[in-house]
């Protein structure tokens, strides 16, 4: 299969999975492994996230603009923005400190990705079935302490296969946030987190990228942008109707199939 087609497929997968709790990075690493696709420093999986970043920023532009323009006058807007920044900080410190270990060890261990997909699937399924009475139904109501703790949960997603959205949503549910607002907070937190990961990874690996790499990243970026817009516009209603169980079953299935492909002789 030509590299450009693999890049297109991986870009579509990135956009389709980035904002749902199934681990986009886990899917990209497993697909790349089985398709024989490798990028210098494992940068492709991170850099095509720019498409997903633009997708969610475009869909939520009106909401973002409203927050920014009301910052001087609305205490609720200020608290929400501060909460997002507090939730973002833990991943900055842990991500920078562990960056090389994550990229050279964890990203190169497909069995770990499969295992975390399965374990995370069972955890998500358990949380979905728990009858937790929500205390918060609007992201603007989240206390700063709640936002910061959700940010600590996000650090778990530095392990590929855990899922950034899955970790933050799980943390929010345990902190008595309802499903829809938990997913929405995860969306907003994704913007600085993914933008930061993109910028730092580009800084660390810019000298390793060739013209061909940039072309493949461009294809993946565009595919992630298009598929990401579709998911962001539809996933909140899907979660409201169906909860997180479908994503949990998908994670478990992908993890089991991945382990089978890795260890069953062919």
Curated annotation (Swiss-Prot):
Transmembrane feature ranges? 4-24, 46-66, 82-102, 105-125, 142-162, 182-202, 216-236, 244-264
Membrane topology per record: Multi-pass membrane protein
Taken from the record, one Pfam family name reads BacA
Keywords annotated in UniProt: Antibiotic resistance, Cell inner membrane, Cell membrane, Cell shape, Cell wall biogenesis/degradation, Hydrolase, Membrane, Peptidoglycan synthesis, Transmembrane, Transmembrane helix
A GO cellular component term found in this entry reads: plasma membrane
Where is this chain primarily localised? membrane
EC annotation from Swiss-Prot or TrEMBL: 3.6.1.27
One MF term in the entry's GO annotations? undecaprenyl-diphosphatase activity
Q: Could you tell me where this protein is found in the cell? A: Cell inner membrane
Catalyses which reaction(s): di-trans,octa-cis-undecaprenyl diphosphate + H2O = di-trans,octa-cis-undecaprenyl phosphate + phosphate + H(+)
GO process terms (BP):
cell wall organization; peptidoglycan biosynthetic process; regulation of cell shape; response to antibiotic
HAMAP family in UniProt: Undec_diphosphatase
What extra comment accompanies this record? Bacitracin is thought to be involved in the inhibition of peptidoglycan synthesis by sequestering undecaprenyl diphosphate, thereby reducing the pool of lipid carrier available.
Give the protein's biological function. Answer: Catalyzes the dephosphorylation of undecaprenyl diphosphate (UPP). Confers resistance to bacitracin.
PANTHER family per record: UNDECAPRENYL-DIPHOSPHATASE
Q: Which family does it belong to?
A: Belongs to the UppP family.
Would you tell me the protein name for this molecule? Undecaprenyl-diphosphatase
> Which species does this protein come from?
Caulobacter vibrioides (strain NA1000 / CB15N) (Caulobacter crescentus)
